């Protein structure tokens, strides 16, 4: 297995797809990385030369990936919560952040239904 950015990428897949196994690299970014490094996107990872792997490592080092990216995203959410803005409060309460309705729907974000006992008459 080839190791890029501390991740073992699968040997049997095309390089273009295998790069997407790294957190922070999607298909578009994988294509741009391959274009910059001059590696053929249709080749399988197991058929890559060592020089090709070195080129890919050099290009991927320019990006924030894996743990650093996760930490950056977490700190951004924490900052929103600390300053007390609406987005931060919505994140803290596990509610939809971008203006979606919550009277109905939003089940994924709010979690399973909690039954509330009806009032006695």
Swiss-Prot record:
UniProt keywords, alphabetically: Ribonucleoprotein, Ribosomal protein, RNA-binding, rRNA-binding, tRNA-binding
Q: In which residue ranges is the amino acid composition biased (Basic residues)?
A: 100-121
Which Pfam family is one of those matched by this entry?
Ribosomal_S13
GO biological-process terms attached to the record: translation
Superkingdom of the organism of origin: Bacteria
Gene3D superfamilies with a match to the protein in the record:
1.10.8.50, 30s ribosomal protein s13, domain 2
One MF term in the entry's GO annotations: structural constituent of ribosome
Query: Region (Disordered) spans which residues?
Result: 97-121
The family database entries (PROSITE patterns) matched by this protein are listed as: RIBOSOMAL_S13_1, RIBOSOMAL_S13_2
GO CC terms: cytosol; small ribosomal subunit
Residue ranges spanning the membrane: these are none
| InterPro entries membership | Rbsml_uS13_C, Ribosomal_uS13, Ribosomal_uS13-like_H2TH, Ribosomal_uS13_bac-type, Ribosomal_uS13_CS
Q: What's the subunit arrangement here?
A: Part of the 30S ribosomal subunit. Forms a loose heterodimer with protein S19. Forms two bridges to the 50S subunit in the 70S ribosome.
Family affiliation: Belongs to the universal ribosomal protein uS13 family.
What does this protein do, in the record's words?
A: Located at the top of the head of the 30S subunit, it contacts several helices of the 16S rRNA. In the 70S ribosome it contacts the 23S rRNA (bridge B1a) and protein L5 of the 50S subunit (bridge B1b), connecting the 2 subunits; these bridges are implicated in subunit movement. Contacts the tRNAs in the A and P-sites.
HAMAP family xrefs = Ribosomal_uS13
> What is the official name of this protein in its record?
Small ribosomal subunit protein uS13
Which organism is this protein's natural source? Prochlorococcus marinus (strain NATL2A)
**What is this protein's gene name?**
rpsM
